[in-house]
Amino acid sequence: MTRLPPRPRVLLADDHIRLREALRDLLEETGFEVVGESGDGADAVAMARQLEPDIVVIDLRMPVLNGLDATRLIKDGRSATQVVVLSAFESPELERQAREAGAFAYLDKGTMARRVHRVLLSAAVQAVLAANLGPPGREAGAG
């Protein structure tokens, strides 16, 4: 039986340090382990490759490399890691773009506080499944 890790590992990437601090506190209080933090998209990609977190939470608008491009690179390099894109904008078009880039979910910062725990738990489950079964659409053992 596939089980969640005791504390799903999360990398936070946002150029606003206060938001990262608030999100880190919320996640750690609810059982997640924040394994790293980044203030720009390129650094977030490098950290995701090095740390191999279960989940990357990344802002859409980041210096150096935006959140959509960073998501594509993270998903290309480690398909089991789930990416949750944050944005100040509630936009179906941006959500569609985030999902096309490989994001597990898109959260607008206005409603994030109410939804982040549930969305990240779902992402942790998907990360475990992807690590054990391969990317969605592939059967276990298919190569």
Feature names for model-found ranges:
Residues 1-9, 117-143:
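Non-catalytic signal-transmission and effector/linker regions of two-component phosphorelay proteins
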Residues 17-36:
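Two-component/phosphorelay signaling modules centered on CheY-like receiver
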Residues 40-43, 65-69:
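Acidic catalytic/metal-coordinating carboxylates
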Residues 46, 68-79:
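Short amphipathic alpha-helix used as the core "switch/output" element in two-component signaling
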Residues 51-57:
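Active-site beta3 strand of CheY-like receiver
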Residues 62:
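Receiver (REC) domain active-site loop signature in two-component systems and cognate sites
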Residues 69, 90-107, 111-114, 118-122:
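Alpha4 helix (beta4-alpha4-beta5 surface) of REC/receiver domains from two-component response regulators
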